[in-house]
Amino acid sequence: MIHAIGTDLVELERIKSIGIDRFKDKILNEDEKNEYAKINHENRKLTYLAGRFAVKESLFKCFKAGDKTANYKDFSVLNDSVGAPYVVSKHTSDFVVHITISHTNLYAIAFVVLETKV
């Protein structure tokens, strides 16, 4: 059963204006920083950050419905062996989490569905 849904749209220019390194330190946890460190292309680093931010904001919208509290670093948004994103967090242990991330040259968007485990 669907517990909650969330979506978020991020302007890449907004992240650039804040500063990529500052933004990275604000939202990424250590596991994500390890993935991020392997990225060589600057534009890919930007879309990685924007995508992670969009997923985490989407998750916050989902948990608002369930009165859960969390911060950015409580969620690891990682990639599996074929590049599909997935979430690791103590806050999601009661749910199956479905996420998708997409981006263009200007924006990144994420959509999250929290499904109650049966």
UniProtKB/Swiss-Prot annotation:
- Necessary cofactors: Mg(2+)
Q: Which residues form a coiled coil?
A: none
Tell me where it resides: Cytoplasm
Which catalysed reactions does the entry list for this protein? apo-[ACP] + CoA = holo-[ACP] + adenosine 3',5'-bisphosphate + H(+)
Q: Could you tell me the keywords of this UniProt record?
A: Cytoplasm, Fatty acid biosynthesis, Fatty acid metabolism, Lipid biosynthesis, Lipid metabolism, Magnesium, Metal-binding, Transferase
Q: What GO CC terms are in its UniProt record?
A: cytoplasm
Q: Name one Pfam family in it.
A: ACPS
> What InterPro entries does UniProt report for this protein, alphabetically?
4-PPantetheinyl_Trfase_dom, 4-PPantetheinyl_Trfase_dom_sf, ACPS, Ppantetheine-prot_Trfase_dom
Mainly localized where? cytoplasm
Q: Which GO terms describe its biological process?
A: fatty acid biosynthetic process
Q: What exactly does this protein do?
A: Transfers the 4'-phosphopantetheine moiety from coenzyme A to a Ser of acyl-carrier-protein.
Protein name, please?
Answer: Holo-[acyl-carrier-protein] synthase
The organism is Acholeplasma laidlawii (strain PG-8A)
